[in-house]
């Protein structure tokens, strides 16, 4: 059976760290930022680490061969 292909959309959105955790950009910052708090805007600036169950799902379904 051939290898599963990596999903191109997931390749652009997620990164796997050396320890195996999955990093992604924070959500909710495309528009409507005027009503957000300054703390939210600061926190959403960088990346976040996905929760363990979500990270496992992303790797299993979308990034089977890593990056």
UniProtKB/Swiss-Prot annotation:
Domain of life: Bacteria
GO biological process: translation
Keyword Ribosomal protein carried by entry: yes
InterPro entries given in the database record: Ribosomal_bL35 (IPR001706), Ribosomal_bL35-like (IPR021137), Ribosomal_bL35_CS (IPR018265), Ribosomal_bL35_sf (IPR037229)
Pfam families in the cross-refs: Ribosomal_L35p
Keyword Ribonucleoprotein: yes
Identification of the protein by name: Large ribosomal subunit protein bL35
Annotated organism of origin: Rhizobium etli (strain ATCC 51251 / DSM 11541 / JCM 21823 / NBRC 15573 / CFN 42)
Gene name tied to this protein: rpmI
């Amino acid at each position: 059976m051939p290898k599963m292909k990596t999903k191109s959309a997931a390749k652009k959105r997620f990164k796997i760290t050396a320890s195996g955790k999955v990093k992604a950009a924070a959500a909710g910052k495309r528009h409507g930022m005027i009503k957000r708090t300054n703390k939210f805007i600061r926190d959403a600036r960088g990346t976040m680490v996905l929760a363990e169950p979500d990270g496992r799902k992303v790797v299993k379904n979308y990034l089977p061969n890593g990056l």
